[in-house]
Amino acid sequence: SINAFVEEMKDKPRMEAYKVLRNWIWYTTALHEMGHTMGLRHNFRGSADQRNFSPEYWDVYNAYWDKVEALRDEYQSKIDAGDANAYQAYVEAVDTIPSTHNRYGSTSIMDYMGDWVKWQYPVGSWDRAAILLAYGNKVEVKNDESGEYTLEQYQTGDFSQEDNYDADEVAASGRKVKYYMFCSDEKVFDDAFCTRFDVGATATEITRNFIRDA
C-alpha cells in the first residue's frame, strides 16, 4: 500500500525514494510492453499462481501472517465474547500491517497488478518460462528429489510442425513438467481468478483488498 511505502521511505534521501518509484512505475511498464513485442500476452492468473511465486514472496508472506496471528491471539477472546469494538479494533490493526509481500505477488510482468507498488522483481517465473519455450524450445522439468526444476530441451523437430513434445514420455522417464497458470483477456470475468488489478492469491485476500481499496 502507499502507506507502507511512505513508512519505508520516510527516513531515506529524496533521491533514493525517487529511484525506487522510477523503477516501480517506469521500469516495470517498459518490461510489460517489451513482453508484448516479444509475443507475450497478458496473464491475469499470474497473481493466483502462488506455487510459482518467487522465494522472496514466501519470506515476507510468512512474516505478515505471523503478525496477523499475533493480533488474532490478542483480540480473539473479546471477539468470541461478542465485543464488536474489539473486532473493529482487530480489523483496523491488521490494516496497519504492511502487506509488502504483494510486491512479489505474481508470476508475470504481463499481469495487471492492483497494488500500486507492484513487485520488486518484475520479470516473473512465467515470463521466463514462456520466453524459454518460445525462443529456446525448452521447458522446465523436475528430474530429481530435490524439488528443484531444471531446463530440458524439446525433442528435436521441425519448428514449423505441430508441437512434438510428449508429456507421457517425460512422465515415463521419472521427470515431471512444471506447470504455470495462464489466463488472458478473453477469459476475464469468466474466472474469478482471471481479473485485472486484483491483489492476492486467494479469494479471501482478493476480496479483502478490493474492500480495503474501495
Regions found by a protein language model. Name each.
Residues 20-25, 29:
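Soluble non-cytosolic domains of exported or imported proteins
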